[in-house]
């Protein structure tokens, strides 16, 4: 399995590197939506430790396990392994001797420790983040949410909380999605834009997308190109969400959306397993 993981990591590194190099051209010709799906396919391939091999040849040629040597007279004599005894020290190696740990086992331990440690680091950070903001959150009753849900034809209504500890709107929760709003006096138009952005993340299941990226990064924690891929995928995830939100919208809505994003941009800590409108956790 470990050999397959290293082989897949090496082969996919070439693909990732190529995509990162040609990204400027792809950005001009293809929307973020296509890059979003390309990274998804690569992440899935990185997670599945199965090598795709060509079928073996139907004809197998077996080589006889025999040793041929010559007498001085030049007459060949066939001697099998069972009857051949080399000269010199013929003492058998003790069957009880075995190395404490092989190199392959050592590599497996190092890789497993790194993979589990990397994954747990992000999961624990996510749990700490949720506990950190919980005392600073309160239920928000905003009628605009119903309007956005109706316009998007979404039946599932997420929980809406106002949190003084965050600096930008975001969505958390895998099974029970929750939209967090910072303690900012938004206009109704701004709220509509913010909620549509986060509801688009919910509709697409983008938190699961992020979890998939973290899983791939955990398995290939030793590969720096995978880190670059995850960074690019998270960026394209937000860009593709923006494209979906403003699709078929008039110029006024696009302007309002751009202004809202600019308003949300500030130096913040970003929770890995959350979506955010260009922001994150307040440093205050």
Model-identified regions with their sequence ranges:
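Hydrophobic alpha-helical transmembrane segments and immediately flanking/interface helices
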Residues: 173-195, 279-284
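A Zn2+-metalloprotease active-site environment signal
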Residues: 204-234
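Active-site recognition of the HExxH zinc-binding catalytic motif
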Residues: 193-206, 213, 241-242
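Juxtamembrane/interface helices at transmembrane-helix boundaries
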Residues: 37, 53, 92-186, 234
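Hydrophobic membrane-embedded segments
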Residues: 1-117, 134, 150-151, 155, ...
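Transmembrane helix-loop junctions in multipass membrane proteins, especially transporters and channels
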Residues: 27-28, 32, 57, 126-137, ...
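Short helix/loop segments within enzyme catalytic domains
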Residues: 136-142, 153-154, 203, 228-283
């Amino acid at each position: 399995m470990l050999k397959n993981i290293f082989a897949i990591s090496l082969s996919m590194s070439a693909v990732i590197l190529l995509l990162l190099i040609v990204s400027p051209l792809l950005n001009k010709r293809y929307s973020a939506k296509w890059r979003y799906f390309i990274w998804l396919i690569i992440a899935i391939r990185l997670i599945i430790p199965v090598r795709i091999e060509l079928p073996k040849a139907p004809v197998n040629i077996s080589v006889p396990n025999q040793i041929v040597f010559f007498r001085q007279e030049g007459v060949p004599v066939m001697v099998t392994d069972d009857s051949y005894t080399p000269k010199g020290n013929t003492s058998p190696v003790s069957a009880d001797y075995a190395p404490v740990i092989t190199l392959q086992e050592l590599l497996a331990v190092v890789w497993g420790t790194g993979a589990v440690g990397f994954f747990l680091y992000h999961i624990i950070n996510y749990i700490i983040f949720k506990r950190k903001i919980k005392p600073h959150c309160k239920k928000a009753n905003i009628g605009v949410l119903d309007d956005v849900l109706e316009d998007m034809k979404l039946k599932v209504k997420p929980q809406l909380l106002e949190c003084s500890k965050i600096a930008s709107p975001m969505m958390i929760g895998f099974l029970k999605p929750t939209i967090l709003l910072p303690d900012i006096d938004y206009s109704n138009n701004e709220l509509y834009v913010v909620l549509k952005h986060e509801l688009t993340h919910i509709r697409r299941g983008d938190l699961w997308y992020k979890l998939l990226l973290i899983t791939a990064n955990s398995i290939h924690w030793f590969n720096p190109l995978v880190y670059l891929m995850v960074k690019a995928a998270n960026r394209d995830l937000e860009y593709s969400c923006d494209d979906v939100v403003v699709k078929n919208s008039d110029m006024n809505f696009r302007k309002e959306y751009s202004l809202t994003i600019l308003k949300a941009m500030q130096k913040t800590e970003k929770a890995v397993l959350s979506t955010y409108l260009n922001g994150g956790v307040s440093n205050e």
